[in-house]
From Swiss-Prot:
Annotated Pfam families: DMRL_synthase (PF00885)
Name of the protein this chain belongs to: 6,7-dimethyl-8-ribityllumazine synthase
NCBIfam families reported for this sequence: lumazine-synth (TIGR00114), PRK00061.1-4 (NF000812)
MF annotations from Gene Ontology: 6,7-dimethyl-8-ribityllumazine synthase activity
Family affiliation: Belongs to the DMRL synthase family.
Alphabetical GO biological process terms: riboflavin biosynthetic process
Pathway membership: Cofactor biosynthesis; riboflavin biosynthesis; riboflavin from 2-hydroxy-3-oxobutyl phosphate and 5-amino-6-(D-ribitylamino)uracil: step 1/2
Binding-site residues for 5-amino-6-(D-ribitylamino)uracil, renumbered to this chain: F25, A59, F60, E61, A83, V84, I85, F116
Active-site residues from the entry: H91 (proton donor)
Catalytic activity: (2S)-2-hydroxy-3-oxobutyl phosphate + 5-amino-6-(D-ribitylamino)uracil = 6,7-dimethyl-8-(1-D-ribityl)lumazine + phosphate + 2 H2O + H(+)
Biological function: Catalyzes the formation of 6,7-dimethyl-8-ribityllumazine by condensation of 5-amino-6-(D-ribitylamino)uracil with 3,4-dihydroxy-2-butanone 4-phosphate. This is the penultimate step in the biosynthesis of riboflavin.
Annotated keywords: Riboflavin biosynthesis, Transferase
Gene3D superfamilies: Lumazine/riboflavin synthase
Amino acid sequence: MSTVKTIAGQLDAKGLKVAVVATRFNDFIVDRLVGGALDYLERHGLDMENVTMVRIPGAFEMPLVCQKLAASGKYDGILALGAVIRGGTPHFDYVCAEASKGIAQAMLQHSMPVGFGLLTCDNIEQAIERAGSKAGNKGVEAAAAMLETIRVMEQL
């Protein structure tokens, strides 16, 4: 029986250049996502001098900014962090759907790993739980996914 070749990404951020796209809407949540993600990446060897922080108004602007950053060729990966909280109108559904699709499109179009840390929550309590409380920190999870994907892509 032959041996299966396995490709896996190591969680080593040394030498990488990363762009972080973070929304200003719901910044009391987003700042916790950013803090957790940057702490995680630094603990895994990322030099903070190699991080470019891009602050944008909200989730709807994320695809455009991620696409521009990916096309620049300056970064190994992008981290998209934000929080959209459901209100009383369908606006939530449109913003979440288009932001998600657009971020995925930028990732695929440019073969650029993008850590997807856009919270889409029904209420503030859910957002708080996902930004470092009961449900962990989704910014950390997005950073880990981005890092592992960068290292996998290097081997393909």
